[in-house]
A protein has these predicted regions:
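Divalent metal-dependent hydrolysis catalytic cores, especially in the metallo-beta-lactamase
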Residues: 2-13
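Alpha-helical recognition segments enriched in aromatics with Gly/Pro capping
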Residues: 6, 18-228
Length: 234
């Protein structure tokens, strides 16, 4: 419909669970991880360049402003590589945590749900899957990494930390951060119920803004510019 070139790889994070666990294993072997009652975390103090990419002032950071507070974390901005399923709960997507990834107390980890034979069930942290898939498909150093500007201080910062800590080389040569698309002057948000999909734009009364509005106004704009889209009320 839009004349866009499809990606060479259409991947799912769940297809890369063994590789994600292997990345956690590498980070553990290199001394970058530690374990709490709810998961395995990346120790950002072991990665001196952690704040450089987003020019973060870590001394002024408050845990709640960027990440969920966890009193067991060594630094508020340390992030989960692998989370343990909560006791008494079962997730739609969870996997066995390999015993060699656990600390010496292993299966006695408090606060973690156990499966058959006391195996601790878990799931990947938010950032782990992206680094894993990128390095598996594109190599340890990729040419261009894109994403939204809102990912700079947390997601992309954490991707860089875990990827470069594991590989020892630069993760991405260039970063292209896209600005936000706004609708009628406001942000697009699930909570506001104002989201529009491409399918919405292709159907019904929105066709009149599709060709000129979407292609010229969105797809052909400078990637770092904020774009506004007005939706007809009829």
């Amino acid at each position: 419909e839009f004349g866009l070139t499809p990606p060479e790889h259409m991947v799912r994070a769940t297809d890369f669970i063994p590789q994600q666990l292997a990345l956690v294993r590498t980070l553990k072997e290199k001394g970058y991880t530690y374990q709490t009652s709810d998961g395995i975390y990346f120790d950002t103090s072991k990665f001196p360049r952690y704040a450089d990419f987003a020019q973060l002032d870590l001394a002024a950071q408050k845990a709640g402003a960027r990440v969920e507070a966890n009193s067991e974390k060594r630094q508020p901005w340390d992030f989960a590589l692998w989370k343990f399923t909560e006791p008494g709960k079962r997730r739609d997507m969870e996997w066995e945590t390999p015993e060699d990834l656990l600390d010496s107390h292993g299966r006695e980890t408090p606060g973690a749900a156990s499966g058959a034979a006391g195996v601790i069930m878990g799931f990947p942290g938010w950032h782990l899957e992206c680094s894993t898939m990128a390095m598996e498909l594109l190599g340890q150093t990729i040419d261009i990494h894109t994403g939204g500007i809102d990912h700079i201080p947390v997601h992309h910062t954490n991707e860089i930390a875990q990827s470069e800590a594991a590989s020892g080389v630069q993760f991405a040569r260039y970063w292209l951060h896209c600005n936000h698309l706004k609708i009628d002057g406001g942000k697009i948000s699930k909570s506001l119920g104002n989201g529009l999909s491409v399918l919405d734009l292709l159907q019904g009364t929105l066709n009149d803004i599709l060709d000129a509005g979407l292609q010229a106004g969105v797809l052909h704009r400078i990637y770092e510019a904020q774009v506004g889209l007005s939706v007809p009320s009829h």
